[in-house]
């Protein structure tokens, strides 16, 4: 089975187009650096991608990097350790981007500017 490839946006503004090329229509702009996308196919210097909201389009390869970020698909708690009995450090809102440091079974260690802790893996999109 082919492994999923996840990349993230390199800049605060990235165009998602209806085809591979600068002359193609911009469907919408992704306005967040570190926004995770899944690669569906590759054509020359372009990737066809899908995001967690199932929006598809083409992004130039120069606009994406391989850095482990995930986006929360639902609101969930961030814990000090990878179990629900440990201290709750924060509450991550839905659609929140977190840097993924590592994952163990059902948990991922994450960080953002305010907290480093553990969140349930099933709450994140952008990692298998």
Which sequence ranges carry the predicted segments?
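SH3-family beta-barrel domains
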Residues: 1-20, 29-33, 40-80, 87-96, ...
């Amino acid at each position: 089975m082919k492994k999923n490839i996840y990349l993230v946006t390199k800049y605060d503004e990235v165009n998602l187009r209806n085809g591979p090329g600068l002359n193609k229509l911009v469907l919408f702009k992704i306005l967040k650096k570190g926004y995770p996308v899944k690669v569906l196919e590759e054509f020359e210097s372009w990737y066809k991608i899908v995001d967690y909201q199932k929006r598809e389009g083409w992004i130039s390869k120069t606009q994406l990097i391989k850095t482990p970020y995930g986006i929360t698909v639902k609101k969930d708690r961030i814990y000090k350790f990878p179990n629900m009995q440990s201290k709750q450090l924060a509450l991550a809102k839905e659609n929140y981007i977190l840097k993924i440091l590592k994952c163990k079974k059902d948990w991922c260690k994450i960080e953002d500017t305010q907290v480093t802790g553990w969140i349930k893996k099933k709450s994140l999109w952008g990692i298998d």
